[in-house]
């Protein structure tokens, strides 16, 4: 019986040579590390070294998160990934009334360079690669990181890492936007230019499908809308006067890995192929690195369950295997208790150990792109590619990603997909072990990690001391220069860095930009 994939595409019970009738390997695949990069962006992939194990972490104060990072490094992680709390993500200080009840809850609270200094205390920034999941205020957190690097004596050209910096997906699926699309895109172009000149090894954006997938997007929708956003960013940078080969090699992407391994592998391979063609054929990129879709993967949090949480260990292992078979460059494996609360030390360690078992106790790293030539995976790769291209064409016909966002297209498509998933789960058609089948009459008790509510008062106290100690006139002068740059065409990151060095807070810097650029109010389109 034919099954339907997550993207609504057919999966036949048996595949044979006829599934690839007229299929040409040299056109569809090429060699690993060569156009169209279907088989991976590097010739040797994991046969030379494994992917980067980059575990996402951050909670409470900078002191607590710093301890967690040091523990992860001691356990063998090769890269850090910083989670920020909602006030930081929205550009508010911890003592702002709107931040009440949210400080340090879903990530670490960062209000100023003082907090950033503590967050990376004892961690040499020239020895570690750091990813920061931050979007609307991405420029601020990047500059705070650079300032801490300067204090450590680390040259900016030795700093490596990534800022997510993908505001378009915030309008589609997540909601942590601040400014309207036009100034947001201007800010992203300023970041591209600044990093080209000042922090050349930094990945300036991580164009993200993960959050769309968590909101309900199918695999085809995930890569279609993500790549459409990527096209918008490339056009923005080119319109700002940049040569495509000057910034495209530092673009990166971020996708989800579900338990449906075959379609996930097909999705990753299709995404690489589409992006390579777009960059070469539409934008005329000639640097091979400009054509490479390099991506980070996180296992699907939306598939984790609060019921029988230990079963999530199995789900995460399966999801991680799919990411590796699909050729990810780095991977975060979720902790089994994340459907309940922030990970404990033990669950975070088990999540990292899951990756280490995949890398060192299996043979998936022994050969490049193990599914190459598989009838089912090659057919599914072609099918996912075709479905994604159809959606991308619809976005183009609306005038690009921003116009489609204003019309509510991507959001409504994702909501329809999410509704279908919910219906199938409620009816039992979609089996979720421990939820709608194989349930326990009584769940075992589980004690989650809890964030101390006193953290909010602690952060407010730190802010009060900072404001009492700093040179307020220097802060005011720097913020005035920032407003002038925002009103004009100068790159805002240079005066922004001066303000942050003078110990202006994240909220103060964002408020200065709000005064000039305003804030985004979503349409009521559904």
What are the residue ranges of the model-derived segments?
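Short acidic (Asp/Glu) and glycine-rich catalytic loops that position anionic groups and cofactors
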Residues: 49, 95-98, 168-170, 206-209, ...
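Short beta-alpha connecting loops at secondary-structure transitions
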Residues: 101-105, 169-179, 212-217, 255-260, ...
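Flexible glycine/proline-rich, aromatic-decorated loop/lid segments
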Residues: 243-247, 285-299, 307-334, 343-368, ...
């Amino acid at each position: 019986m034919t099954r339907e994939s997550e993207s609504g595409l057919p999966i036949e019970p048996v595949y044979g040579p006829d599934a690839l009738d007229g299929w040409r390997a040299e056109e569809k695949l090429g060699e690993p590390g060569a156009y169209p990069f279907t088989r991976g962006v590097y010739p040797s992939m994991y046969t030379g070294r494994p992917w980067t194990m980059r575990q996402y972490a951050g909670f409470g104060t900078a002191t607590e998160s710093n301890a967690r990072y040091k523990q992860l490094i001691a356990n063998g992680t090769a890269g850090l990934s910083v989670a920020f709390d909602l006030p930081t993500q929205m550009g508010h200080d911890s003592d702002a009334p709107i931040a009440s009840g949210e400080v340090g809850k879903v990530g670490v609270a960062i209000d100023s360079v003082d907090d950033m200094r503590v967050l990376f205390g004892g961690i040499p920034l020239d020895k570690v690669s750091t990813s920061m999941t931050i979007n609307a205020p991405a420029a601020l957190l990047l500059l705070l990181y650079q300032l801490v690097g300067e204090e450590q004596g680390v040259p900016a050209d030795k700093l490596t890492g990534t800022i997510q910096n993908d505001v378009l997906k915030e309008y589609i699926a997540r909601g942590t936007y601040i400014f309207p699309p036009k100034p947001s895109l201007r800010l992203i172009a300023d970041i591209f230019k600044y990093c080209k000149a000042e922090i050349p090894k930094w990945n300036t954006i991580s164009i993200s499908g993960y959050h769309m997938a968590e909101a309900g997007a199918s695999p085809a929708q995930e890569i279609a809308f993500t790549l459409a956003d990527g096209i918008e960013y490339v056009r923005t940078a080119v319109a700002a006067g940049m040569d495509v080969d000057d910034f495209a090699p530092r673009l990166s992407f971020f996708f989800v890995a579900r338990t449906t391994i075959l379609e996930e592998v097909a999705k990753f391979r299709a995404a690489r192929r589409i992006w390579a063609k777009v960059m070469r054929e539409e934008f005329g990129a000639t640097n091979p690195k400009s054509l490479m879709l390099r991506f980070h993967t996180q296992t699907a949090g939306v598939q984790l369950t609060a019921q029988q949480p230990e079963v999530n260990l199995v789900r995460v292992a399966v999801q991680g295997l799919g990411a590796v078979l699909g050729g990810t460059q780095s991977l975060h494996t979720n902790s089994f208790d994340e459907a309940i609360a922030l990970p404990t030390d033990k669950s975070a360690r088990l999540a990292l150990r899951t990756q280490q078992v995949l890398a060192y106790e299996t043979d998936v790293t022994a050969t490049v792109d193990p599914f190459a030539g598989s009838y089912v995976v090659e057919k599914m790769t072609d099918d996912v590619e075709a479905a994604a291209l159809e959606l991308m064409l619809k976005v183009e016909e609306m005038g690009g990603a921003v116009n489609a966002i204003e019309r509510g297209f991507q959001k409504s498509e994702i909501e329809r997909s999410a509704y279908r998933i919910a219906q199938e789960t409620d009816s039992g058609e979609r089996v979720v072990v421990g939820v709608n089948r194989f349930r326990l009459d009584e769940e075992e008790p589980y004690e989650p990690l809890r964030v101390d509510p006193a953290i909010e008062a602690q952060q407010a106290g730190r802010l009060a001391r900072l404001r009492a100690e700093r040179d307020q006139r220097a802060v005011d002068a720097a913020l005035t220069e920032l407003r002038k740059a925002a009103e004009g065409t100068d790159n805002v990151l240079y005066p922004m860095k001066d303000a942050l060095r003078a110990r202006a807070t994240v909220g103060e810097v964002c408020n200065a930009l709000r005064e000039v650029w305003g804030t985004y109010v979503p349409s009521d389109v559904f």
